[in-house]
Amino acid sequence: MKLSLRLISALLMSVMLLFATGMGPVEARTCESPSNKFQGVCLNSQSCAKACPSEGFSGGRCSSLRCYCSKAC
């Protein structure tokens, strides 16, 4: 009886460790909105990212020739 209890305990601990290491860190969702202040066709994501903080966003990127600002929701 003692051996089977130890075996069950060891198996349970192994399963718990397996699941604990399989979970990764959780990231916040990213919300995007078209920029209101960026003028012209967006070809360079760096210039888009520089325009977005003035609109209250943390960054930005070009997509479909338009500047989209982003921040954590």
Swiss-Prot record:
It is found in: Secreted. SUPFAM superfamilies: Scorpion toxin-like. GO terms for cellular component: extracellular region. It holds the Pfam family Gamma-thionin. The keyword Disulfide bond applies. PROSITE patterns: GAMMA_THIONIN. Its main location: secreted. SMART domains: Knot1. Residues 1-28 form the signal peptide. It comes from the Eukaryota. Keywords: Antimicrobial, Disulfide bond, Fungicide, Plant defense, Secreted, Signal. Belongs to the DEFL family. PANTHER family: DEFENSIN-LIKE PROTEIN 1, DEFENSIN-LIKE PROTEIN 10. This is Defensin-like protein 10. It comes from Arabidopsis thaliana (Mouse-ear cress).
